[in-house]
Amino acid sequence: MSRRRKKLPQESITCEIESLSHEGRGVSHKDGKTLFVEGALPGETVTARYVNSRRSYDELAVEEVLTQHPQRIEPDCQFSKLCGGCSMQHVDLGFQINHKESVLLDHLRHFGDLKPEQVVPPLVGAGRGYRTKARLGVRYVAKRDEVLVGFRERYSNFLTAIDECPILIESVGGRIPELKALVRSLSGYQRIPQIEVAAGDDMCALVIRHMDPLTEEDLQKLIAFSEQTGLAIYLQPKGPDTVAKLWPKDGQELLSYQLRDYGLTMQFHPMDFTQVNRDINRRMLAQALEWLQPQAGETILDLFCGLGNFTLPIARSAAHVVGVEGSEDMVRRGYANAELNGISNVEFHAADLHLPLAPAKEAKHAWLRTYDKVLLDPPRSGAEELAKQMTRFGAKRIVYVSCNPATLARDAGILATQGYKLIKAGVMDMFPHTAHVESMALFEKA
């Protein structure tokens, strides 16, 4: 028998906000219970309504700000109070980045008992139109005979009824009503659950997931939309491996972005992982290479290398670079990008980097050898197994690019036991207006 959900208090309460949680929510207390208040800032007095209740804490959302923080601003997006895509549009970018830096340092201190010798200035960029990769939910609402396209509401599985998205690349974020109308015009409009957005430097693609076959009339409508907007249309009838380009019929399935500082063109499929913020990606690369300092005689290991975003820039300076990635498809993409750019001093391998490292003598693990330096860019789960055996590679310098400060701190603590010292750390604002923290850390062998 399922447990009956506790009924939420209906009356709003007044909260004195004491601090900000790592997730960017105001923290208060009432009757010995912690309150997390969405949309509230430290030092503010607000009225808030209950949206969720747990045994040890309650979640609330701001209704009215009675005493305002000096850095509170009017959100740039009219849908910010309802849409769950952003959580910090109510405060200026300076406050956001300072908060993210504090989160990073707190995690390093609490989880790794570490403090970097130097905290470097943050990498920051534009707060609008930065997002080149996103998954938009699609849902038909029968009561209103309307198709919604966008992100989920906060504290809900419903989609937010939006007409624009200022953080998305303009060619898509400014066309939400057109996307709604397009989906509604298709025969299977009730069976289209999502649209993937992926943009290169010169082309933006929409990958439309459709559960039912499309008619010839549907295809013509999609082609007409592509020609009117300049957006490429890809169709996905089943799993990711079924994605195929519908229009334009130019023989080019891949998108691309330029890394001009290194004379590189990086090609990728719309379903490949790429960094969502192209400007911050370029700044991140510059900082990573400055910290890594690849030299002409060195062999360097790039772990979780993806399609070669770090591998190929490093190869412009190093003698040899080895990229390792969990996906065979990404290994093939890495080799293809190397060939496209005339780079021959690289090799790519596929391996599950979350498992304990196998004996180096196994042929399929030929990449398990010594290196001068290591760069790693793991997913949110981090690189615990690699950190435990990092001395095996013999590297004197490690650059760790992180999308989760908690796992970075955990792995940094492990690296410290392996004899590596935390020299520098800093944040990168890859996702403005969210509490998401991207960071970079430099370790050197003590």
UniProtKB/Swiss-Prot annotation:
Pfam families recorded: TRAM, tRNA_U5-meth_tr
Gene3D superfamilies, A to Z: 2.40.50.1070, Nucleic acid-binding proteins, Vaccinia Virus protein VP39
Active-site residue list: 403
Domain TRAM stretches: 6-64
Tagged with keyword Methyltransferase: yes
Endpoints of the signal sequence: none
Function field: Catalyzes the formation of 5-methyl-uridine at position 1939 (m5U1939) in 23S rRNA.
PANTHER family, sorted: 23S RRNA (URACIL(1939)-C(5))-METHYLTRANSFERASE RLMD (PTHR11061:SF49), RNA M5U METHYLTRANSFERASE (PTHR11061)
Protein name: 23S rRNA (uracil(1939)-C(5))-methyltransferase RlmD
Organism: Hahella chejuensis (strain KCTC 2396)
Gene: rlmD
